[in-house]
Amino acid sequence: MKYNPTWSFVTYWTLLGKGEIDMPDGFPPFDNTVDWCGPEDDAAFSAMVPDFILEAYVGHAGYRHDHGYATPAALRPAWCRRQYLWRLLCDYRFRADLKHIIKREIKSAARRKQAKIWVRLYYWSVRCGGWRHCAR
């Protein structure tokens, strides 16, 4: 089936695990060792962005974001073909996925509050960091 950026984080990973999502040609499978977020065209800034936000591994959100960016118009749902709107949806979904991961993985309210500051930095590193942010 076609990828839809409105799917929840859990739905996306469930369908991906079952192999039910049409993937772009040549798009690599998820690899825990390389899928982390940080703009690859700015090494100094990338070094500031961690693989983990406190205890939460967030490469899953980065992988999904890259999947959305790499999805050609033919594999997108009919309701969204415009490139700008599609990228905006992917970016918003990335932020929502980050928040979901933080909420699920970090149990302490004080630690979650700290993590939200990192989420903001992380999100803007992706928005401002170029076309692709994962180290592929």
Describe each PLM feature range.
Residues M1-R136:
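Extended terminal accessory/targeting regions
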